[in-house]
Amino acid sequence: MMMTAIGLMSGTSLDGVDVALIKTDGRHVAALGPSGYRPYTETERGLLRQALAEATGLDRRDARPGILAEAERAVTIAHAEAVAAFVAQNRITAGAIDIVGFHGQTVLHRPAAKLTVQIGDAQALAKAIRIPVMHDFRAADVAAGGQGAPFVPVYHRALAQSLGRDGPIVVVNIGGVSNVTYIDGNDALIACDTGPGNALLDDFVFRAIGKPFDCEGRLAAQGTADEGWIADALQHPFFAQRPPKSLDRNDFASLGLRDWSPADGAATLTAFTAGAIAAIVPLLPKPPTSFVITGGGARNLTMMRMLREQLEPARVESADALGWSADAMEAQAFGFLAARGLKGLPLSYPATTGVSFPMTGGLLARP
């Protein structure tokens, strides 16, 4: 049975709440609906930053000492307001929505200690919006020994299947770190980080010319990549490791950057990101026939050109070119995961989070 679901996502950047509507049965995506955004106020951001600092001392996932209780109330209200504004703007009645997927705000994620904490009161949210709310998606995976992330690959698979193409297909998300989802048409999924995404490049560009990023890859387009440095950097042991594998934004900070001109440095680090993505291909079960690029890197035209060169003969295209929304993808994913959780379908797999068997997850709060 097809359901109309709303997904809600509040990410680590603490910018605000993304909202997206999706029609799905938890296996297939029938339609992608509108999306919206409710920014956090400066006061709310400050409160969340304090909550992140205070959460480092937590040893129980249900504890809300001090500022955490206040932050949880603020997160819940912000999400309720986001849903109310979204349904009003799009002239949707609450009764037309079957389920809301509520990720909450992660304040602590320590999978080695089997502890992941997302704040947000799902019961209060369900009452406020008068729609059932699926929440607490990561807890079961972490309790079973998984990493509790990534959870979006199962949604990537549904999107890829909707293309009706022969595979394998790889969805590449180029954020601060780059990660991939490998989809071969079977039920198994492989997901992992591939290396630096925009983080090294953005940091270099900021130091070199004071801009936060290389807009459309214009600076890199004027430079020449340092191929010797790239070859050395790709000798880092991470690139030979088989998936699943993950890293942090700062794991490559120790690579010694040379005294490049701004354009040559941007060209080198853009090519390094592309080369790191290409380095995963020999570690996959079969060579992919197409790559779909999402995240900020998809808007970098030089990055896209370099990826096409590195990944040929496979097809390389941006998510937006396929009618997917790079900006709404995570919110859509949690609408999709809510439908899956309702049906007891797996949300995570051994080759995505490292959990020992496919795991469902999520708890249901009724209004």
Swiss-Prot record:
Alphabetical list of Gene3D superfamilies matching this protein: 3.30.420.40
- GO terms of biological process kind: 1,6-anhydro-N-acetyl-beta-muramic acid catabolic process; amino sugar metabolic process; peptidoglycan turnover
EC number of this enzyme: 2.7.1.170
GO molecular function list = ATP binding; kinase activity; phosphotransferase activity, alcohol group as acceptor
Keyword Ribosomal protein in annotation: no
Q: Which UniProt keywords apply?
A: ATP-binding, Carbohydrate metabolism, Kinase, Nucleotide-binding, Transferase
Q: Name one Pfam family in it.
A: AnmK
- Residues annotated as binding ATP are 11-18
Q: Carries keyword ATP-binding?
A: yes
Q: Which InterPro entries match?
A: Anhydro_N_Ac-Mur_kinase, ATPase_NBD
Pathway the protein acts in: Amino-sugar metabolism; 1,6-anhydro-N-acetylmuramate degradation; Cell wall biogenesis; peptidoglycan recycling
This enzyme catalyses: 1,6-anhydro-N-acetyl-beta-muramate + ATP + H2O = N-acetyl-D-muramate 6-phosphate + ADP + H(+)
Under the heading NCBIfam families, the entry gives: PRK09585.1-5
As for what it does, the entry says: Catalyzes the specific phosphorylation of 1,6-anhydro-N-acetylmuramic acid (anhMurNAc) with the simultaneous cleavage of the 1,6-anhydro ring, generating MurNAc-6-P. Is required for the utilization of anhMurNAc either imported from the medium or derived from its own cell wall murein, and thus plays a role in cell wall recycling.
For this chain, the family text in UniProt reads:
Belongs to the anhydro-N-acetylmuramic acid kinase family.
Kindly give the HAMAP family that the UniProt entry links to this protein: AnhMurNAc_kinase (MF_01270)
Protein name per UniProt = Anhydro-N-acetylmuramic acid kinase
Species: Rhodopseudomonas palustris (strain HaA2)
Q: What lineage, starting at the top, does this entry show?
A: Bacteria, Pseudomonadati, Pseudomonadota, Alphaproteobacteria, Hyphomicrobiales
